From Swiss-Prot:
GO terms for molecular function: ATP binding; ATP-dependent NAD(P)H-hydrate dehydratase activity. PROSITE patterns: YJEF_C_3 (PS51383). The modification Phosphotyrosine is found at residue 85. This is ATP-dependent (S)-NAD(P)H-hydrate dehydratase. (6S)-NADPHX binds at residues 153, 205-211, 274. It comes from Macaca mulatta (Rhesus macaque). The lineage of its organism: Eukaryota, Metazoa, Chordata, Craniata, Vertebrata. It is an enzyme of class 4 (lyase). ATP binds at residues 245-249, 264-273. The keyword NAD applies. It comes from the Eukaryota.
Length: 389
């Protein structure tokens, strides 16, 4: 598993690059103006230097205000968690909070609830997935949620059987959904569940993508045409956004293909995809919340909904040169649960390096710890990141 320091750095990178990708998806007129020379329909684009599009990113970060109420900047639900698997829903839910959501709910099996709750008192944990009334228990919370992240594990048999009902209820309320892990397995079994629902974002890794592709298109993935394969899968599912994670993340909404090749961490370990899906949940809400006024009059194109973002799977941790202990447990000595009063964070260090596209150096632990502060408390200037970044 990733270290706590690595997890904090990964969330920092995820937040910046994923916000940029979300802005690209939703606002076609500004995007065409900014990247007119590079972008055309049905063409693959590799994005490395997107300095001109960073204003789109800044525009969708909601500014803090004393007039707002709790929950207005994001109430995210994560569905998943059983006795054997408590880490994935925790990482997804806590990532949503670290990116800037106000409230994060976890709907899990009863055996997982005490463990997940013990990880963080900030999470609102509902032990309902193994209840005969699981769908009803989750559905009554849907009017209060802005997005749902599905992390169902096949080990949660009763809850997994109710997953379809929860998804259908979410679609009926037009709630954006992010589907990862075994949620993708269920989609492969029943593609009609998300067919044509363009507020769905699928985040498969290589193996999950191959399974989905074979189930939907009845054939193997063309290894020589990965870009076309992602495009075809998205089209076959009715222009659902597909994010194939890998060395280069390939993103498609069925109309365009975007390849993000910005390098993340070279480590591949458990928990990285969970950071992505949890971050996506709140970013979907932010992008929809921003509205056309944030794009100089550009109309919100719901057919595009959102590009799946490129996740920075983690900037190498300072601990032991990026080879620290493989744990994300809350007791990890590398990143305390609460910032130490003796530590004065360096404002936005790892974010600054990402925005400037400088060579990425391992972030300091204070930088990782201060991510949540800067994403939530440096937004007072009309949603803009601090100029110091």
């Amino acid at each position: 598993m990733v270290t706590r320091a690595g997890a904090g750095a990964a969330v920092a990178a995820t937040a910046v690059v994923a916000l940029l990708s979300a802005a690209l998806a939703l606002y076609r007129p500004p995007l065409d103006a900014v990247l007119e020379r590079a972008f055309s329909l049905r063409k693959v684009h590799s994005i490395k230097d997107m300095e001109n599009t960073l204003q789109l990113v800044r525009n969708i970060i909601p500014p803090l205000s004393s007039t707002k109420h709790k929950g207005q900047d994001g109430r995210i639900g994560v569905v998943g968690g059983c006795q054997e698997y408590t880490g994935a829903p925790y990482f997804a839910a806590i990532s949503a909070l670290k990116v800037g959501a106000d409230l994060s709910h976890v709907f899990c099996a009863s055996a997982a609830a005490p463990v997940i709750k013990a990880y963080s008192p900030e999470l609102i944990v509902h032990p309902v997935l193994d209840s005969p009334s699981a769908v009803d228990e989750v559905e009554k919370w849907l009017p209060r949620l802005h997005a749902l992240v599905f992390h169902c594990e096949r080990g949660t048999q009763p809850g997994f059987l109710f997953w379809q009902g929860i998804l259908e209820a979410s679609k009926a309320r037009d709630i954006p959904v992010v589907i990862d892990a075994d949620g993708l397995w269920l989609v492969a079994q029943q593609p009609a569940l998300i067919q044509g629902y363009q507020k769905a974002v699928l985040t498969p890794n290589h193996m999950e993508f191959s399974r989905l592709y074979d189930a939907v298109l009845r054939g193997p993935v063309d290894s020589d045409d990965r870009h076309g394969s992602v495009l075809r899968l998205s089209q076959a599912l009715g222009n659902v956004t597909v994010v194939q994670k890998g060395e280069r993340d390939i993103l498609s909404n069925g109309q365009q293909v975007l390849v993000c090749s910005q390098e993340g961490s070279s480590r591949r370990c458990g928990g990285q995809g969970d950071l992505l899906s949890g971050s996506l949940g709140v970013l979907v809400h932010w992008a929809l919340l921003a509205g056309p006024e944030k794009t100089n009059g550009g109309m919100l194109d719901l057919k595009l909904t959102i590009w799946g973002p490129k996740i920075e799977t983690g900037i190498k941790t300072r601990a032991q040169g990026g080879c620290g202990p493989r744990t994300t447990a809350p007791t990890s000595p590398h990143l305390p649960l609460s910032p130490s009063p003796q530590v004065q964070p360096s404002p936005g260090g790892c974010i600054r390096r990402l925005l400037s596209h400088q060579a990425v150096q391992p972030p300091s632990l204070p930088e990782a710890r201060s991510l949540h502060h800067h994403l939530r408390h440096d937004r007072r200037g009309g949603g803009r990141l601090p100029q110091a970044l």
